[in-house]
Amino acid sequence: MKILWAALVVTLLAGCQADVEPEVEVREPAVWQSGQPWELALGRLWDYLRWVQTLSDQVQEELLSSKVTQELTLLMEDTMKEVTAYKSELEKELGPMAEDTKARLSKELQGAQARLGADMEEVRNRLLQYRSEVQAMLGQSSEELRARLASHLRKLRKRLQRDADDVQKRLAVYRAGAQEGAERSVSAIRERLGSLMEQGRLQALTSQPLRERAQAWGEQMRGRLEKVGSQARDRLDEVREQMEEVRVKMEEQAEAFQARLKSWFEPMVEDVRRQWAELMQKVQVAMGASTPAPSQKP
């Protein structure tokens, strides 16, 4: 009987040892702690999973209350959102890159993103499954469930790290392509500016005779304008002299006409004056003859 009990105990211990895998140390990605925003978000998710993997009393309590899965969902969404934002930022700088190369890099990065998202989703589903299994045990011992969960979490964290490293490498290739494209753009701009400066210098050299001809033409036009102005001033002086001559002639003609009028009317006036004087004299004489002489008293 004792032998049977001993065999049973050995079998149980062997089974427990088979279920619980030896814990393999997972390398902590220190680069996630200080890098791009998506790396910082992934670092927060990694730290949270490491805390969940401890399966402490607080962790188990929050697992049963769905708090862990809710927090994990927020961290997953934040991480994937930052990855997408960083990818979009790099894509804007990939202009000079060939379209086929850009399409290939984008496809590879999308695949890495999908694998990373699937890893996160599997972690969450495994935690939900653990919650359902614990609730189904109705107060019975859950040590075996915790052991299996710890084993799964170790495997999932290793897979998550592998796929996160893959995403990081793909983004590094993207970033290198963006930097190369930026350098090509700067080089093209420099070449273009150099070409424009050379063209400007050549145009300046070729435009020198044009400027000289323009200056000569301007001097010629200025001389012509001055000549025309001088001629106009001379003509104006001539017109003024002619007007003065006309005025003098008109004054002389007016004086001559006045003299002629005077010579016409003066004899007539004198004749009328003389006749009037004679008439008045006759009237006076006639009036004197008709007046009676005063009578003399004796």
UniProtKB/Swiss-Prot annotation:
Biological process according to GO: acylglycerol homeostasis; cholesterol efflux; cholesterol metabolic process; lipoprotein metabolic process; melanosome organization; phospholipid efflux
Record key words, sorted: Chylomicron, Endosome, Extracellular matrix, Glycoprotein, HDL, Heparin-binding, Lipid transport, Lipid-binding, Oxidation, Phosphoprotein, Repeat, Secreted, Signal, Transport, VLDL
GO MF terms held by the record: cholesterol transfer activity; heparin binding; phosphatidylcholine-sterol O-acyltransferase activator activity; phospholipid binding
Gene Ontology CC entries for this record: chylomicron; extracellular exosome; high-density lipoprotein particle; low-density lipoprotein particle; multivesicular body, internal vesicle; very-low-density lipoprotein particle
First and last residue of the signal peptide: 1-18
Region annotation LDL and other lipoprotein receptors binding: where it falls in the sequence: 152-162
Modified positions (Methionine sulfoxide) in chain numbering: 137
UniProt modification remark: APOE exists as multiple glycosylated and sialylated glycoforms within cells and in plasma. The extent of glycosylation and sialylation are tissue and context specific. Glycated in plasma VLDL.
Residue ranges of Sequence repeats: 75-95, 96-117, 118-139, 140-161, 162-183, 184-205, 206-224, 223-241
Pfam families hit by this protein: Apolipoprotein
Source species, domain of life: Eukaryota
Binding site for heparin: 156-159, 218-225
Main subcellular localisation: secreted
Ranges where the record places region Specificity for association with VLDL: 260-272
Region called Lipid-binding and lipoprotein association, residue ranges: 204-272
Region (8 X 22 AA approximate tandem repeats): 74-244
InterPro entries assigned to the protein according to its UniProt record, in alphabetical order: ApoA_E, Apolipoprotein_A1/A4/E
Protein's cellular compartments: Secreted; Secreted, Extracellular space; Secreted, Extracellular space, Extracellular matrix; Extracellular vesicle
Function: APOE is an apolipoprotein, a protein associating with lipid particles, that mainly functions in lipoprotein-mediated lipid transport between organs via the plasma and interstitial fluids. APOE is a core component of plasma lipoproteins and is involved in their production, conversion and clearance. Apolipoproteins are amphipathic molecules that interact both with lipids of the lipoprotein particle core and the aqueous environment of the plasma.
Subunit structure: Homotetramer. May interact with ABCA1; functionally associated with ABCA1 in the biogenesis of HDLs. May interact with APP/A4 amyloid-beta peptide; the interaction is extremely stable in vitro but its physiological significance is unclear. May interact with MAPT. May interact with MAP2. In the cerebrospinal fluid, interacts with secreted SORL1. Interacts with PMEL; this allows the loading of PMEL luminal fragment on ILVs to induce fibril nucleation.
Family, per entry: Belongs to the apolipoprotein A1/A4/E family.
Protein name: Apolipoprotein E
Organism phylogeny: Eukaryota, Metazoa, Chordata, Craniata, Vertebrata
Gene that this polypeptide is encoded by: APOE
